[in-house]
């Protein structure tokens, strides 16, 4: 597969690993990565989100894990070929059995999920997922630092259940970004950010990716300006 080139790094791709997509770019661009020294990405795939995070937070140390050995190897290669490789590492690891004494300031994930009408290839890959939302949340609650944050991008319909499960695990909603493909359609994704501290108010944001078919919105162009090579 062709590599995907960004301004400051290149992402090599592989047929057995989820390719670079809008979800990952949005998560990498919009997640609050400030003041996070130790960062964990769960389900790194190509390593895209971890690389974007490393670029945005130059003092962070990033661990990226994936249950797919091909993905972990590919991410490791992409890290080494970047300017950020000295503070990044990729591991072939199942999050359910991930052993660590470290507490993370930020745990970030673009978890696998079922689409309503996915392509056959993606449907097969997603149906082989080992990590359920419930497992993702409970494990995160164990290893998140006291003042840490947990940030994910998920399908819009999954939001209420995901938020409820987080609250049951003492992870409280801090920020909700509702993502629309364009202004005339139903919401497509949610970017959710949680902390272990119960918040008095939740930050609510709206994000629209396109102003017309295949024409990015000004909001998207601004959010990704440090990454994409737009003409």
From Swiss-Prot:
Aminoacyl-tRNA synthetase listed as a keyword: no
Gene3D superfamilies from the UniProt entry: Vaccinia Virus protein VP39
Pfam families recorded: MTS
GO cellular component: cytoplasm
Catalytic activities: adenosine(37) in tRNA1(Val) + S-adenosyl-L-methionine = N(6)-methyladenosine(37) in tRNA1(Val) + S-adenosyl-L-homocysteine + H(+)
Function: Specifically methylates the adenine in position 37 of tRNA(1)(Val) (anticodon cmo5UAC).
Protein name, per record: tRNA1(Val) (adenine(37)-N6)-methyltransferase
Organism field: Flavobacteriaceae bacterium (strain 3519-10)
Organismal lineage: Bacteria, Pseudomonadati, Bacteroidota, Flavobacteriia, Flavobacteriales
């Amino acid at each position: 597969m062709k590599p995907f080139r960004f301004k400051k790094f290149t992402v090599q791709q592989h047929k057995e690993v989820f390719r670079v997509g809008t979800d990952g770019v949005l998560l990498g661009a919009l997640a609050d990565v400030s003041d996070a020294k130790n960062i964990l990405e769960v389900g790194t795939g190509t390593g895209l989100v971890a690389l974007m995070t490393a670029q945005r937070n130059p003092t962070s140390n990033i661990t990226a894990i994936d249950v797919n050995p091909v993905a972990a190897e590919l991410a490791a290669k992409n890290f080494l070929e970047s300017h950020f490789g000295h503070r990044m590492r990729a591991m072939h690891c199942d999050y359910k059995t991930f052993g660590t004494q470290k507490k993370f300031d930020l745990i970030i994930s673009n978890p696998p999920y079922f689409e309503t009408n996915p392509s056959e290839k993606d449907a097969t890959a997603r149906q082989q997922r080992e990590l359920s939302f419930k497992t993702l949340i409970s494990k995160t609650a164990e290893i998140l630092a006291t003042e840490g944050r947990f940030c994910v991008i998920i399908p819009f319909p999954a939001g209420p259940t995901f938020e409820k499960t987080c609250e049951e695990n003492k992870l409280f909603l801090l920020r909700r970004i509702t993502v629309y493909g364009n202004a005339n359609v139903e919401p497509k994704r949610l970017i959710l950010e949680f902390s272990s501290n119960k918040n008095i108010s939740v930050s609510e944001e709206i994000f629209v990716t396109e102003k017309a078919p295949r024409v990015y919105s000004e909001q998207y162009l601004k959010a990704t300006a440090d990454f994409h090579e737009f003409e």
